[in-house]
Amino acid sequence: MHGTMHDMRTAARSLVRAPRFTAVALLTLSVAIAVNAAMFTFVTAVFLRPLPYASPEQLRDVNIDALEGRAFVAPRIRQVTGVLAPQGGVAPYTERGFVVSQTGPAAEGPPIFVPGAGADDRLFGVLGVIPALGRAFTAADIVPGAAPTVVLSDRFWRVSLASGPAVIGSTIRIEGREHLVIGIMAPRFAFPDFAEIWVAQPMADARFGETRVLFRGRAGNAETAAQALEAALGASGSEAHVRMTDLLPRGGALLAALLGAICFVLLIACSNVANLVLARGTGRRQEIALRAALGASRGALVRYLSMEGLLIALGASVLGTLGSVWMGDLIVAAIPSDGLPVWFEMQLDPSVLGYIGALTAITVLISAALPAFTVTRGRLATVMNEAGSRSTGDRSSTRLRASFVGAQVALAMVLITGAALLLRAFRSMNDVDPGYAADSVVELRARHAGLPGGDDFLRAALDRLSGVAGITAVAATAAGPAGRAVPTSDAERAVAPVTLAVSAGFFEALGLPLVAGEAFEPGREQVGVAVISESAADLMFGGASSAIGATFAFDGDSAELTWRVIGVARDRRRPSIGGRGIERQRYVYVPITAALAGEVQLLARVDRADPLSTASASMAALRDLDPDVVLRTPRMMGDVERDLAGNVRFFASVFTAFGAVALGLAALGIWGVVSYTVSRRTREIGLRIALGATPTRVVREVAVDMLRPATIGLACGSLGGIAMGRLLRGVLFAVGAADPASLVFVVLVFGGVTLLSAWLPARRAARIDPLAALRSG
């Protein structure tokens, strides 16, 4: 112990006497550890930390796939709960938003839109949670005629109600009705992820497609329950595929790629510092030889040399831990506020601290212990002879330096290849033509506590918007009945297209042309007519020409309720990631008077250079029309379409940032090794120049020694880049895992950076003054 403490004090004094080396090594490792710790904290918070429910691993979301095979659309919540109840707990719920008014202490201010859920008395019990204040729903809250009740989230209570202590037993107005507040949930609770209020709601009449089902199974019986439900649905004439999915998001291969990327950054940083330590140790071989001559064993020498690396690693861990908090804030700030669930929390828990401890151990092993073992190799006489010369050290040190350079190049190549693939995929997704004038259309979502989809509100809203300067066409849309299937030309198959209720002028405002037939006419009552998309026409009637004048009915409707096709619109298109190409969306458009709309999407075609200023004027016009209308932030439809590439954009940003850091570290490593080689071979190079070597030859010989391991690193990195592409397949679009263009681009860029990093110090070698070099030797 005394020897260890003595070595530690000696190492500390040595580091103080070499401030540049200490600062560079400390900064390099601190940044790498901070990046690793911040990303691991984020990954832990999103993917690994248990959800705020009792035994969350037992919970499953029941998904009934009605898009393929015989579509399942009948309102059978009771049947599903009846089948699943013997297998475990089951609770239906409806994820939706609510218009809430009179929330302030003085009941002032406009109504607000609040995400939430409709639930009955089973939901909180199946989740295994109880309110922090008050109570949960009971059967008495669900019976017909019961007083409306609501449970609030902790955040809604604190932000919207200012943590009023008397909130339990008070009322707030939701969707135009007074609701009694009966409970407040714990701070981190949310289900679904973004819900802030839960309204008591009977589920007996809910439709699939509008309502989801939560299931708490017993150990390993989720598949059995799914099979039993499929069998029951099939026996009742509704074929469907039932999937039980975990509530916790799974990263899979993408998570492995992300964790691999941050580890690569650390390994590159460790390789860089190891090269610095190795160069520093080689320059101290005379000191090492003297200690060995005085009786120090190799183990004692390794311990002595490793102490410097240990102190640097410990210091970098402390700085990296502090820096990870700041980097974590940057990561969270880069994600939209509505992109993270309520239960998300970045914190340095024991798992993160353990991860940082493991990083420290890896850092010490690579950047300190390995160079120390290498420097102390060899016999004493050999070490003494080398110590008295200006050589670059023994062959093992040279090989290890070259290996570190090759490893840095290979790891950086993998990261940059991943970034190139993701950037190409992101660009390809943004280049997809959506089929309409998305960048010229502003979307405003309006909701009212009364009847926002009523004719009076719509007519007045559209009239007001038409008078706003810069708007050339307006229309309104609302979601139609969800999960409603229609027959196809194949009698054995049905599909469930997206049903939209639209106003007259919708296709003009959206810039979505018709390929056959006509659109809905303004000022004319149209009942029982529909416009369908090209892909829907192909499936339902075998083509657009056959669709005009044909009739169809939604499953579950009476035989008398049919729809006549009067037009066929161009398909709306969007990219489908994971190598599935461009998705042609199937739509059925019906007149908006034929649907009950909970939220209206107002669309305005604009021709001004600043469309968002037009949107602001539009919002003012609507609020002037009705102060109680709730408006969401206006957006360009082009931005809405581009949001589909959100995951790709996130991974592309992460890999680009990591790739840039890795490229810089690798270039710095090559430059440092070549610079060190030049400094140790000054006398030799001066002698060669004195004997007639040309500057070009000197540059070539100095640089080639480093280009060999770099070339091997490029080859290995190319293979690793292909493997990384395979891990990223889940977020790639129109780009293969082994995309030749991306690989060639990365090789050329990295090859150029490698040449430049080696050429700059090699050029300095060619300018050495032979006489000065020989005198210094």
Roles of regions detected by a PLM:
Residues 39-42, 274, 310-383, 424, ...:
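Small-residue-rich transmembrane alpha-helices
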Residues 115-139, 148-253, 329-330, 459-653:
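Mid-to-C-terminal secondary-structure elements
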Residues 18-46, 50, 268-271, 313-317, ...:
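Short, strongly hydrophobic transmembrane alpha-helices
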Residues 1-23, 243-248, 276-303, 307, ...:
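Alpha-helical transmembrane segments of integral membrane proteins
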Residues 1-24, 52-54, 65, 145, ...:
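Membrane-helix entry/capping segments
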Residues 48-99, 212-216, 429-487:
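Membrane-proximal extracellular/periplasmic loop immediately following the first transmembrane helix
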Residues 269-313, 669-710, 714, 764, ...:
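Interfacial "coupling" helices/loops that link adjacent transmembrane helices in transporter permeases
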Residues 31-58, 327-335, 411-440, 675, ...:
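Alpha-helical transmembrane segments
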